Amino acid sequence: LGDAYAPFSVTDDPNRPTFQVPNIGLADEAETRRLSDRIALRKSLDTLERAFDREGELGALDEFEAQAATLLTNPQTRDAFDLSKEDAATRDRYGRNRWGQQLLLARRLVEAGVEIITSNLTGPLCGRVNNWDDHAVNQHQFEALRFRMPTYDRAFSALIEDIYARGLDKRVL
């Protein structure tokens, strides 16, 4: 699909109290105006560069810049990443762990209009292996799955229930 469709990755643990997504939102209206001025200036300066762009790579750059501007200027984007706006019962229902809060974040992003979300459930919750591929250390599968499966079941069932309760089932595959 090209670079313009590369994912925006969130690598921090959404269950951490200090969770935040870097470079989301601007502090005030003055910063938003300055960003708009910079974008306009850059567009006026890159006309010569476009004349020599035979590969069309600047089109992908334009898409990146539009996405970045949206991330910086749209308060709905910043709010979607703010899990403190969820009540404690909802956060508990998903599970107060990395996986549960990732899936809660996925639901919030769908509500904010994000069309494609991938949640990568790896990390320390997987036991001795950092992913779901246990065949290399299969003597520990039961131990790992005994922990993983209830955690996964809790988070994923909460996501499915929320998707239907909020009427998102027509937009989520």
Model-derived segments and their meaning:
Residues L1-L173:
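Ligand-binding pockets and gating/stacking loops
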